[in-house]
Regions:
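Extracytoplasmic small-molecule ligand-binding "clamshell" domains
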Residues: 27-105, 264
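Bilobed "Venus flytrap"/periplasmic-binding protein-like clamshell domains
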Residues: 43-48, 59-74, 106, 127-184, ...
Length: 279
């Protein structure tokens, strides 16, 4: 009788010990947040319809990524803080611990995955915006770009793609691509409208927004490539927050929460995804 009680007591104690060791591990991610009770998202509000200021250059940050990251925070029972950050400073801010997550229309890329964890959420791909009539007959990132002038956002994956094509052009004896890199997408658009470049390489969602605002002057080149690229949210490498975010994003996609946000900003909910191949 006493031996049975002893066994039961030991078993209960063992379970309690195991639960005690598991519970803190599950809560560690909250202890590591930049601000207690808040999910801080580094975001570059210069990229409609993904993220932009409600008043153009000031006010509340809105857009698909802003709303989706807010939905994520709500799912995790946290407040959301949108921390406006320059494009080239997004990943450095994350690795320096100034934000918990970077949810702001960044490609899932090997370069970024080398220093951060990525959680895919939307299929996308680059496109080319050109002057109406496409006078240089550019179709995509291909030999059609050799000898042309192309604008890109500096430090973006698209910049890397165009630089790679420039090398291919030159290695095959063709004229290279004159690449102009700008800090902001709006500056690439201004360069195209002012005739300084022949085309802009941007994500498909940005291309659509650019053309919608300049329908009489610009168009999307007929051609597409790398259609299986994904946008991804980034978290510090090896963080306890990563699996939490991944699970929450999967839930928000499966229950239709993020699909409603996509429709709100005229994005295709069929492109929502939880997997992706890095470029």
């Amino acid at each position: 009788m006493n031996s049975k009680k002893s066994i039961i007591a030991v078993s209960v104690a063992t379970v309690a010990l195991l639960l005690g060791s598991i519970a803190p591990a599950q809560a560690d991610w909250k202890a590591d947040l930049v601000t207690k009770g808040t999910l801080t998202n580094c975001i570059d509000p210069e990229y409609p319809p993904m993220e932009y200021y409600s008043n153009g250059t000031s006010g509340k940050i809105i857009g698909f990524d802003a709303d989706a990251s807010a939905a994520l925070a709500k799912e995790l029972k946290l407040k959301i803080k949108q921390l406006a950050t320059s494009f080239d400073g997004l990943i450095p801010a994350l690795t320096a611990g100034r934000c918990d997550i970077v949810w702001t229309a960044l490609y899932l890329s090997n370069k970024r995955l080398a220093v951060a964890d990525g959680v895919p959420y939307l299929e996308t791909g680059p496109g080319v915006v050109v002057a109406k009539g496409n006078p240089k007959k550019i179709s995509d990132i291909s030999f059609s770009m050799c000898g042309t002038r192309i604008a890109v956002q500096g430090a973006s994956a698209n910049e890397g793609l165009v630089k790679a094509q420039d090398k291919v052009c030159q290695d095959t004896g063709k004229k290279g691509i004159a690449i102009s890199s700008y800090p902001k997408v709006a500056e690439t658009v201004a360069a195209l409208l002012n005739g300084k470049v022949d085309g802009i390489v941007e994500t498909d969602v940005a291309c659509g927004d650019i053309v919608n605002k300049n329908a009489k002057k610009l168009e999307v080149a007929k051609g597409y490539f790398l259609g299986d690229v994904s946008f991804a949210a980034y978290i510090q490498k090896g963080s306890d927050l990563t699996p939490v975010v991944r699970k929450a994003v999967e839930k928000l996609i499966s229950n239709g929460t993020i699909a409603k946000i996509a429709k709100k900003y005229n994005l295709d909910p069929e492109k929502l995804t939880t997997v992706g191949e890095p470029i």
